[in-house]
């Protein structure tokens, strides 16, 4: 039976992955300012924020940005982290705008958006050398919101690992999908407490992290039922499980062969809670 996803009628805070939401509008909305430069990122973000507030009726809004050098910590773990990413492009035709103008325009739109948001009743968080993902992980677990319903706004699957707490939800705007831990387990066959480990096996192309060859999420779901359980499984426990199989399948052999890759990915994919106050 498919679980229902009805957000509890309690105090609510929505926590927004700001760059994720900005880029969706920036690449799609063709709006231009009087000088003939794009301003769709700024306009689209504000409109999206208005709609989120209408739909979820939050008591507070927290907007989280990547800090300067936010990826540095993970890049020290793996130099290939986020390497080779293509520049963000408009998915529509622009009228002869040079790359340097487009890059400056994107920065200008974000700075303008910061200013607009500073005049609104929202909280903005941005910390040098900390990624927005980690700030969001901190906010949803902050004691201030212990009795609140927390709704994270992002299309990023990294946040699935937070859904082990029943008070945390995720709204995926592109998919128009509202998820909690029960729904994730139903859809993916993997418990939120073990989702980061499953992703470490699968890899993440968007962050340039290679997984175990020929082992995707479907194979993981079918052959590693240990990841369905609520108890968080460590990498070492997973490898012990693979060794103990009387009849080892290819998936078990591959995991043992690529142990170090899985461990490295897992360290990067885990969300860390920075020591911040707000």
Predicted regions and their residues:
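Noncatalytic, basic helical substrate-engagement surface that gates or grips nucleic-acid strands
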Residues: 4-151, 159-178, 270, 275-278
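Non-catalytic nucleic-acid-binding/docking modules located in mid-to-C-terminal regions
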Residues: 4-10, 55-65, 80-94, 120-124, ...
């Amino acid at each position: 039976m498919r679980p229902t996803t009805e957000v509890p009628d309690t105090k609510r805070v929505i926590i927004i992955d700001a760059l994720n939401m900005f880029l969706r509008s920036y690449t799609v909305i063709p709006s231009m300012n009087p000088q003939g430069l794009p301003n769709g990122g700024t306009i689209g973000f504000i409109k999206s924020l208005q709609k989120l507030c209408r739909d979820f009726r939050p008591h507070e809004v927290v907007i989280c940005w990547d800090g300067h050098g936010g990826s540095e910590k993970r890049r020290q773990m793996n130099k290939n982290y986020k390497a080779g990413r293509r520049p963000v492009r408009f998915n529509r035709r622009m009228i002869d705008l040079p790359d340097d103008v487009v890059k400056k325009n994107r920065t200008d739109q974000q700075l303008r958006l910061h200013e607009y948001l500073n005049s609104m009743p929202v909280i903005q968080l941005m910390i040098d050398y900390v990624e927005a993902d980690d700030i969001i992980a901190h906010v949803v677990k902050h004691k201030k919101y212990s009795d609140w319903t927390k709704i994270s706004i992002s299309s990023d699957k990294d946040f699935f690992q937070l859904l082990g707490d029943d008070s945390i939800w995720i709204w995926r705007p592109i998919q128009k999908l509202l998820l909690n831990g029960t729904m994730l387990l139903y859809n993916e066959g993997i418990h939120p407490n073990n989702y980061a480990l499953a992703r470490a096996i699968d890899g993440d192309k968007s962050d340039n992290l290679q997984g175990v060859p020929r082992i995707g999420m479907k194979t993981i779901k079918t052959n590693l039922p240990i990841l369905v359980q609520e108890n968080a499984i460590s990498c070492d426990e997973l490898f012990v499980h693979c060794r103990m199989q009387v009849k080892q399948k290819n998936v078990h052999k591959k995991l043992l062969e690529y142990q170090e890759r899985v461990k490295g990915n897992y360290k990067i994919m885990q969300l860390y809670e920075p020591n911040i106050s707000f």
